[in-house]
Amino acid sequence: MKIKISLLLLAVLCNFSVFAQSDFDKYFEKKSLRVDFALSGNLKSQSAAIQQLREEPVWGGPVKNLIDKSGYGGYYINVYDKATNKLIYSRGFNTLFEEWRSTEQAKTETQSWTNSASVPFPKTPVYIEITARDKADMQFHPLLKQEVDPKSIFIDRG
């Protein structure tokens, strides 16, 4: 009886693994899209702008658990399928810019800091969104949302 339950549990877990993998394969290539972006601002406000998109030959991130539900980090990078507006990838992260915004200098100066994040390379057009946590309500609010076509001539293929 224990063997039957163990085999059934193993079969169920294998099926979940196959479905998670197929979701990756449905939306992404096995390579990376590096998103170089600037975070600019001061203590009171901030904004973001994409500086460069670069195709990289290998995806070293997860192929399962593509949506980060942890809520950790001061920022999130989200990827939405353009056709359905479905969230297909997300990751939380922190930056030195976020720490700098808490300094005395940020009360009187505005600065811009360059950052990079890698996402799986999409097969079809997507929206890339960068959100920031608002310390007042602890919710994430969008800093930018930009359409990215994987066939674009503006993606550095070098």
Describe each region flagged by the PLM.
Residues 69-92:
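Extended low-complexity, serine/threonine- and proline-enriched intrinsically disordered segments
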Residues 9, 24, 66-68, 106-108, ...:
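Residues embedded in well-ordered secondary-structure elements
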Residues 88-108, 144-147:
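Solvent-exposed serine/threonine-rich low-complexity stretches and specific carbohydrate-binding patches
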